[in-house]
Amino acid sequence: MTANARSRAPVGLDVPRNRAWRGLRRLALALLAVAALPGAALAQDREFGSEVELVDPDVLRVCADPNNMPFSNQAGEGFEQEVAQLLARKLGRSDVTYSYFPQATGFVRMTLGSNLCDIIMSYPQGDELVQNTNAYYRTAYALVYPKGGELDGVTLLEDPKLKGKRVGIVAGTPPGTYMAKAGLMATAKAYPLVIDTRIENSAQSMMTDLAKGEIDAAVLWGPMAGYYAKKAGEDFAVVPLTHEEKGPAMAYRITMGVRPADQEWKRTLNRAIAENQSEINDILLSYGVPLLDEENRPIAPSGKAAASGGGNDADRANAPAVGPKG
């Protein structure tokens, strides 16, 4: 979903159900609809759902964005790249290779669907464009603001302290619904959702504006909020927005995406996720990702959940049933 093309962030999981699917489709890899996934690269003259598994048995072939931190970049940085390296070691793969393409419309078709790679490292659970593994992390949109200021203690977008403040928001993402309900849109600053990540970065631009004082707070997809706040030092609070009610979900499970035919590959990855969850968590946390358990409690290093926090019934009602380690 990024603040870039897909933001790696969900852009709407609302009720009724048809809205939920539209939202997930928009999220996944630009979260824009990709109507058809041709299977010309598959072994049979079929579409994306060919029954033949084409996974490379020796090399972990990863589909990635060339400039989309904290997820990945062409320099080999990002938590997706580190998780991929971990999986390669655990699965006995001799190497990790990458097929880079901006995560905008056509990403799945041009990478996984063309058999250039065998795994998309981050994909929202429930989207139809790929087959999902079990989730390997769960996070939420987050509010970022300077520590020690008048916004200290804010955990809801409807908090009166935000009235009249200039809040940055990526256009078309779920927090916008709550901001509109709270009357914050009149003074909000919108940043584009669909962009070419090689040229611009909405999350980075938003955090730069926050540091300059051009906006008072920022609302971003959790991994981006945590990463850019961490890069800025200890000056910003990152608050997962898990207490919003009566609107689209704000917390989502993130999986790995594989081809629909790759059933054994999916099972292999599910085992690897379950066996290495603590190490995966530590990688994500090192990038500032605000990890949440199923009750919206923050997850600490080595997978230990903190004692505080609370669940969001709307999120659990809208989210698919499969948990992080099913």
Cite the ranges covered by each PLM segment.
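Bilobed "Venus flytrap"/periplasmic-binding protein-like clamshell domains
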Residues: P66-P70, Q74-K90, L143-S202, P223-M224, ...
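Extended ligand-binding regions for polar small-molecule ligands
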Residues: Q44-D45, G78-L91, G149, L157-P174, ...
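Extracytoplasmic small-molecule ligand-binding "clamshell" domains
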Residues: D45-Y123, D127-E128, T197-I199, Y287
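Acidic, polar ligand-binding/catalytic clefts
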Residues: Q85, T97-K161, G172, T242-A249, ...
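Periplasmic-binding protein-like
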Residues: D65-P66, R138-E150, K230-I273, P290-R316
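Alpha-to-beta junction loops
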Residues: R93-D95, G113-S122, K165, L210-L220, ...
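Immediate post-signal peptide segment of exported/extracytoplasmic ligand-binding proteins
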Residues: Q44-A75, E158-R166, G309-G326
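Ligand-binding clefts/hinges and TM-proximal coupling segments of bilobed small-molecule sensing domains
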Residues: Q44-V52, P174-I195, N270-G326
